[in-house]
Amino acid sequence: MKSEFNNILIENPELNNNSIVEPNPLNENSLNASLTKNLSLKEPTRTKKIILSFFTAFIFFSLLFFLYINKLPNINLLNNKYISLASTDKKSKNYIELKFNCKDPTIPVQLFNSSNDIKNHIKTLNVGGKDENITENFTFGFAGKYKVIIQFKDKLTSLKNLFSGCAQLSIANFEYFDSDEIVDMSGLFEGCLRLKYVEFGDFNTKKVITMENMFNGCINLNQLNLSNFDTSNVQYMNGMFSQCEELFSLDLSNFNTKNVIRMDSMFRGSDYLFILNMSSFDTSNVQDMSKMFDTCSNLPSLNISHFKTSRVTNMESIFHNCRKVMTFNLSQWDTSLVTSFSSMFSGCTKLSNVSIEHFDTSNVMYMDNMFLRCLNLTYLNIKNFKTSKVVTMENMFNGCEMLTSLDLSSFDTSNVVNMAGMFCSAFSLRSLNISNFRTKKVERMDYIFNHNLMLTSLDISNFDTINVDIKRNFFNGINPKGKIYINFDKVSNGILKQLPRGWEFIEK
């Protein structure tokens, strides 16, 4: 008892020797009983509250899960394992393996966009290890990574648009697929935004006729091995690698393109592409090359001197925005059937030299934007251009900041209706020969000589602009002094009002 008392002293420093009172046994027992009672009341109450909270939360989330899961298709997406389809003959099972990276479970998995009713050829669709007879698009219930196997009950002849718009597909494996009868691969992966890799194995493409838009819009595709492709019967490659924005290197040296008739937009928008091997290309039957390399802005050079272009009719925007290419060797190109050079070299900001003096332009109708913003182009020999069929030359040399002279005396402009901005912002242009221009049909000439800062002499004596109404921006920003040779009888009032002050007018 004494030790207990000493403890009380330690715990209660306010007590001293003069106020020490011997503890009452009765009071001590009462105190112990009270403490025991309080503890016995508090502990169960706290435990009960915790248990009740957990139980309530469990009921709540279970209810939410039940309501959500009832909205999903009746397929098993929770078991995330590959099924085993091992076989000594890889193609005997005739299936395609897929991997999906599902970030938004509300987006449907587009597997059946084909117009040739591919879903009727599907034997089973295995999702997460369980075979499901699914004949319509479905959604993954939860975000995550999934493995899917599509097994076919017979040989297909077409894969057209099979995965088109399948934005959550990341990897496709055709190693076990029987491709012997395939003739159509157009749009196969078009719009597969998350596709990064495709394993084709020994995919048989011998009978394939079209690969149009095959990888178009695969903006995350970063590697492709097509070394086993037999393209000897392919006729359509237009848009094949368009918008492959992460593709750095592409080796097509094995491609046989002797039967290809369309290559338009083939590499368009593949702005990360740095290495492109087309050494085996035979383009002797190609008719359309428009936008073929459009916005391949990372390509440092293009080895296309061997291209045969005698059947090509359209070269619109073929090199548009090839910003790093400094020179093009087109000396062997036959352009006799081409009708459009529109935007052909526009945006080639580093282009300094291009040999096109031999071009046959006798059938060309469109030359608008042809050299637009060729900022480093210093020389251009186009004296031999035949332009009698051309209807538009709008912005043809606009932004050619380093070009110092242009001899267009041989140009026949009798059918041109639009010359707007034709020489605009050619800041360094000192010599411009347009003395033989015929402009009777021209309807637009606005901005034609804007910002020709170095130009001191201009012969527009043959200009007939009576039908052209230009209220402003004909000579805006031109050199403050110079000479203009003009025929006042053929010049509209709108142009007369804009003749630059400080210039000497010489009537012819």
Language-model regions: role of each:
Residues I448, R472-G477, K483:
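Small/polar residue-rich beta-strand/coil "junction" motifs that cap repeat-based extracellular fibers
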Residues Y146-K155, Q168-E181, L193-I209, I219-Q235, ...:
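Structural signature of tandem-repeat unit edges
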Residues K160-N161, S186-G187, E212-N213, N238-G239, ...:
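Register-specific detector for alpha-helical tandem repeat solenoids, activating on a conserved position
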